[in-house]
Curated annotation (Swiss-Prot):
The modification S-(dipyrrolylmethanemethyl)cysteine is found at residue 241. Disulfide bonds: none annotated. The keyword Transferase applies. It comes from the Bacteria. NCBIfam families: hemC. Its cofactor is dipyrromethane. It comes from Desulforamulus reducens (strain ATCC BAA-1160 / DSM 100696 / MI-1) (Desulfotomaculum reducens). InterPro entries: HemC, Porphobilin_deaminase_cofac_BS, Porphobilin_deaminase_N, Porphobilinogen_deaminase_C, Porphobilinogen_deaminase_C_sf. Tetrapolymerization of the monopyrrole PBG into the hydroxymethylbilane pre-uroporphyrinogen in several discrete steps. Belongs to the HMBS family. One of its GO terms (cellular component) is cytoplasm. This is Porphobilinogen deaminase.
Length: 309
């Protein structure tokens, strides 16, 4: 085993928190190994004035780290799983998926009001088409405003742009120690989360058995299965950041359950499907639920969304 391992991370406060957390877990299990964190900015970190849907999604928050891995400048990289494309560059693999935190979306409102308590025509900040579509389906009166930037920036915009509320991933808020600011975790019946939301993943080289073996110690089997089902569904639907697809999978009574949604951008139509399978059939479950969505009208919705890009 190498005695010094170089770990890649984006340089945002949340990304660094997640990377340090992974390193801490590995240090407990491997006290003789030294870990060094190296940070870099990704394309998604630099292009803050453009909506995610307009930039495209392939490796927006991962590519620079992946290039560094392939060039052997770093040994592995820590990501939010929801930022990882469903198809990874040749030679790279997800070496571990850690135990998932709350996968839901959280509402932070200026006066602590819940979603149902917000006034008619409330201005809500979010840049996710998935959130926009589902929220408009629930409350067509909402005025949705684009919201980019890191977590600190987004929190400031709640006040500076006089928004009634902003929607962020609950896990990120909690990791930053801001859970007291959450007015409500939005129920899945209202808004299903992004694929992989709430889970931290570690990407490494496929041909690096030492690192792969090291990462086994932080893998969480149930989270891995659940997120594999979600990513399989997304891969089948060929969806990325710019497509309104939500999904959530979990293990219940030794069965893997998956619920997913496809929506029109304006929220006028939301198609929901679910399925279950054995825990070791995650990929099959994802495809099965994706096929249900397509048959129920999801195919037409996705074609229309892509035609309008």
């Amino acid at each position: 085993m190498k005695h010094k391992i170089t770990v890649g991370s984006r340089d945002s406060a949340l990304a660094l928190w997640q990377t340090r957390w992974v390193v801490e877990q590995l240090e407990k299990q491997n006290p003789d190994v030294t870990f060094e964190i190296t940070t870099m900015k990704t394309k998604g970190d630099k292009m803050l004035d453009v909506a995610l849907a307009k930039i495209g999604d392939k490796g927006l928050f991962t590519k620079e780290l992946e290039v560094a891995m392939l060039q052997k400048e770093i040994d592995f990289a820590v990501h939010s799983l929801k930022d990882m494309p469903t198809a990874l560059p040749e030679g790279l693999i997800i070496g571990a998926v850690c135990k998932r935190d709350n996968p839901g979306d959280a509402l932070i409102s200026k006066d602590g009001r819940k979603l149902d308590e917000l006034p008619k025509g409330a201005r809500i900040g979010t840049s996710s088409l998935r959130r926009c579509a589902q929220l408009l389906n629930y409350r067509p009166d909402f005025q949705l405003e684009a919201l980019r930037g890191n977590l600190n920036t987004r929190m400031k915009k709640l006040v500076s742009e006089q928004l009634d509320g902003i929607i962020l991933a609950a896990a990120g808020i909690t990791r930053m120690g801001w859970e007291d600011m959450i007015a409500e975790i939005i129920p899945f019946q209202v808004c299903l989360p992004a694929v992989g939301q709430g889970a931290i993943s570690v990407e490494c080289r496929e041909d690096d058995p030492e690192i792969l073996n090291l990462l086994k110690g932080i893998e969480h089997t149930e989270t891995k299965a659940a997120t594999e089902a979600e990513r399989s569904l997304l891969r089948y639907l060929e969806g990325g950041c710019q497509v309104p697809i939500g999904a959530h999978s979990e293990v219940k009574n030794n069965r893997l359950m998956l619920t997913a949604v496809v929506a029109t951008l304006d929220g006028t139509k939301v198609i929901r499907a679910q399925g279950e399978n054995e825990v070791n059939k995650a990929v099959e479950l994802g495809i099965e639920v994706a096929e249900k969505l397509m048959a129920m009208g999801g195919k037409k919705i996705l074609e229309e969304v892509r035609a309008g890009e």
